[in-house]
């Protein structure tokens, strides 16, 4: 599955080495914070129920369908909490959101001047949607679509 990883023979490590290994793993895999870390032991035969539950949750999150009105309300809530930063004299204006696919879930946000939204705000929205709709254990893609202004003259379209 996309949201699961494993480490073998952890029980052979000392407590100190195991703790240092966990810290190093979290540091190096910071970009996978959305993935659950399940600790199992084949030797002690524990953790498998947690692992299977995590697999089921990741699968359910990857295929979850989220209605457009709920996504749009969540988008407005996210923007109300934290406005997109100004760029080029204006502020990007997200208008609505819909689900553009599943496995992994894709949330498509439509609006004006969205090409000016930076990576940090994209990560903020990803975290907000992930928490709001319980999308743990699966990657989440955010796409921005800006409608062209029909009143802006483009010399190339003559």
Residue ranges and their predicted role:
Residues 52-59, 65-117, 122-125:
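Long, well-ordered amphipathic alpha-helical subdomains in the mid-to-C-terminal portions
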Residues 141-149, 158:
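Terminal-proximal interaction/regulatory segments of ATP-powered molecular machines
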């Amino acid at each position: 599955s996309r949201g699961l990883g494993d480490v073998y023979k952890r029980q052979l490590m000392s407590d100190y080495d195991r703790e240092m290994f966990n810290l190093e793993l979290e540091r190096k895999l910071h970009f996978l914070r959305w993935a659950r870390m399940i600790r199992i032991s084949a030797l002690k035969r524990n953790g498998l129920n947690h692992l299977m539950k995590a697999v089921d949750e990741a699968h359910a999150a990857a295929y979850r369908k989220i209605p457009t009105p709920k996504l749009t309300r969540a988008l407005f809530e996210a923007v109300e909490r934290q406005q997109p930063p100004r760029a080029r004299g204006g502020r990007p204006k997200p208008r609505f959101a819909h689900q553009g696919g599943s496995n992994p879930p894709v949330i498509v946000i439509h609006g004006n001047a969205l090409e000016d939204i930076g990576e940090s705000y994209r990560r903020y929205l990803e975290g907000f949607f992930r928490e709001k709709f319980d999308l743990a254990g699966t990657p989440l893609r955010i796409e921005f679509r800006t409608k062209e202004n029909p009143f802006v003259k483009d010399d190339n379209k003559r």
